[in-house]
Amino acid sequence: MTEKTIKDWEALAEKELRVSPEGLVWHTPEGIDVKPLYTSDDMSGIGHLNSLPGFEPFVRGPRATMYAGRPWTVRQYAGFSTAEASNAFYRRNLAAGQQGVSVAFDLATHRGYDSDHPRVQGDVGKAGVAIDSVEDMKILFDGIPLDRISVSMTMNGAVIPILASFIVAGEEQGVSRDKLSGTIQNDILKEFMVRNTYIYPPEPSMRIVADIIEYTAKEMPKFNSISISGYHMQEAGATLVQELAFTLADGREYVRAALAKGLNVDDFAGRLSFFFAIGMNFFMEAAKLRAARLLWTRIMQEFKPEKASSLMLRTHCQTSGVSLQEQDPYNNIVRTAFEAMSAVLGGTQSLHTNSFDEAMALPTDFSARIARNTQLILQHETGVTKVVDPLAGSYYVESLTNELAEKAWGLIEEVEALGGMTKAVNAGLPKRLIEEAATRRQAAVDRAEEVIVGVNKYRLENEQPIDILQIDNAAVRTAQVKRIEETRRRRDSQKMKQALDALADVARSGKGNLLAAAVEAARARATVGEITDAMREAFGDYTAIPEVVTDIYGKAYEGDPELGVLAGRLGEATKRLGHKPKIMVAKLGQDGHDRGAKVIASAFGDIGFDVVAGPLFQTPEEAADLALAEEVTVIGVSSLAAGHRTLMPQLAEALKKRGGEDIIVVCGGVIPRQDYDYLMENGVAAVFGPGTQVLDAARAVLDLIEGKRRNV
């Protein structure tokens, strides 16, 4: 048989297609041109091909036997309502096969507010569990043996009081801190880029990171001091190259901060962990994890560690939240299963699989069971655990691994040229690039250039709402306030004040360890809010200035008659109003997830609206004041954290009290269909759920403006 060449294949492909196979090249958002065929020629120059699992550069995995020796940890992220409700949920799941606990805190806790603070009325218990003191933490882990069950906590802004409360809760359960195992996220740099649950400015925030690394290295040898997260970057719109590069650049910055504390790299590097998102780009996501291990080894070699474990990247993964769709939601089960398989083939150490209903609300017991069992089926029924790194040697996957690594390294070097990640964050580079990528993707989805089944193709004509978990925010807040009052009544106030004063002195002086001081304050029953405020006196608050990218969404629609018709209507409305229709895009409460708000502000601006980008964390009253001062026609509220039932009626009432009834109020985001009527009855003119195309939303807003003008 005559050996065939790539030229032979090209000729045959062209005969089948009747055009050149070059038209099959997939131009990805990462700037990688994926070919329809890969061969041994694509392996040339790839340096890691002969590496083995358990040995540097760890492309094939950090452990020699990987899942053949022990499967990945099933670690489902959850938390809602009260500590009692979340504890019951954790215990049910542990009994059903879950192998670790991963805690989701509510936004009030993330931002360092106690549940009785007036700014968090709509946030308590809604998107996670409310924790105000050690008393809540003890209830959260009641009956869960902390010396045997590892605990992961997603916490960044209020990381000091939360970790301190966890340490004390463990002590009072009879588990000393050196026996506690798990992970604290403690990744503040990405908060300034995408998630926004920061409290203090970047510099003191980096001190907090370093103090936690120092404390855990000395006192908590089984505990991971940081989980460096790319997950939230991808959720905010980052490409896989951006997620990879910015996450590893964050990691490099944290290592430098720990070294500046006088630590030896081998004292802490083995306890650094990572956290990546896994989306629907199946092979590229698996290759991303392989590239991450390769690049992290390269970065850590700069610091000349003696232990091989200091060079290893160990990661947790979570299936994509962005890929979850409200429309035809049972499709999400399939999406999550594919993403889980991709994470496993990429070599994750632990995994969370999202529940199919999380595009609308917190998961129910039913949806959480399906999500958990997705992993158990992978572990026990597919045979995927039997072979270490089964994708190794694949022409396609090895080429992708190499190209992702090269492109990510180029972006890492760009960050270095700015002086490292803290300076890059201050310069706004990562945030701008991620927001541009998010806006481009929204345009691609709206134009059906990127197909999402059930959303922009193969849509159901009639969809039935599914059962969702509803949280009674008012009841949760009442219960939390009662417990706070009881805690304050029973504690030794003088001892508590002395502990807070000592913490404030450590913060002001720069001497001592913040976490060590906070542990004493938590033991004296200082609350999360009180510990946060003690440090706030020294560090101050951080306030981001809203900025919006331009000419991204509009460019995607250049020459499109659909946009031309809308622009014509906007021109007519401008003549009638005497100015461009003006919309304020607002975020209420402690919901810092601003991807949707930024995309809407950017796209509406490109379409021709006059856009006011409101600041994060506004109260309804503050939003009403700003809307009146800016003389806006419309307020568009983006809600992604379930606070809409409380905050939207409060906004309508605030506008009414100020004589702003004529301002049209609309909202969009993660809002269950079951809530639409309630919102419409409480001052909301239109609701735009997940999957709404931007041009459809713009047309609907313009319809409301025209109708309002005609009624005047």
Swiss-Prot record:
It comes from the Bacteria. Residues 580-712 form the B12-binding domain. It catalyses: (R)-methylmalonyl-CoA = succinyl-CoA. Its EC number is 5.4.99.2. One of its GO terms (cellular component) is cytoplasm. Substrate binds at residues 73-77, 183-185, 195, 222, 232, 271-273. Its cofactor is adenosylcob(III)alamin; a monovalent cation. Homodimer. Belongs to the methylmalonyl-CoA mutase family. This is Methylmalonyl-CoA mutase. The lineage of its organism: Bacteria, Pseudomonadati, Pseudomonadota, Alphaproteobacteria, Hyphomicrobiales. The gene is bhbA.
